[in-house]
């Protein structure tokens, strides 16, 4: 799996960017750009289980691999949820799981720089 990397600088303090991106309402707002109605169920605490879901309830089953407040969060995606059933062991899922979604937040002049990477590690 190829690692994809995206970067953006946001004119806001790092703590505000973090809180907005990971808070329930802020998460719904920014993910609406690619999946209207997306939300999560669970906690951002290290080791916690978290589900990323569409309005129909389909989505991903994941866990928080790392969480350093206002600096870095790593999501380990373990499988899919389809029609209420968690799948972490099918051939389809084993082809890509685990996959990681990492967010790095850093201070820059005038705001916060966010680097997002998606891949196997």
Feature map (PLM): residue ranges:
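Hydrophobic pocket/interface hotspot
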Residues: 17-21, 27, 50, 64, ...
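Hydrophobic/aromatic beta-strand elements that line small-molecule binding cavities or substrate pockets
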Residues: 6-8, 61-66, 98-107
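Short acidic/polar mixed-charge low-complexity motifs
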Residues: 2, 56-58, 97, 110
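A generic structural signal for beta-strand entry/edge sites
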Residues: 1-3, 70-72, 109-113
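Glycine-rich portal/gate segments that line the openings of hydrophobic small-molecule binding cavities
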Residues: 38-89
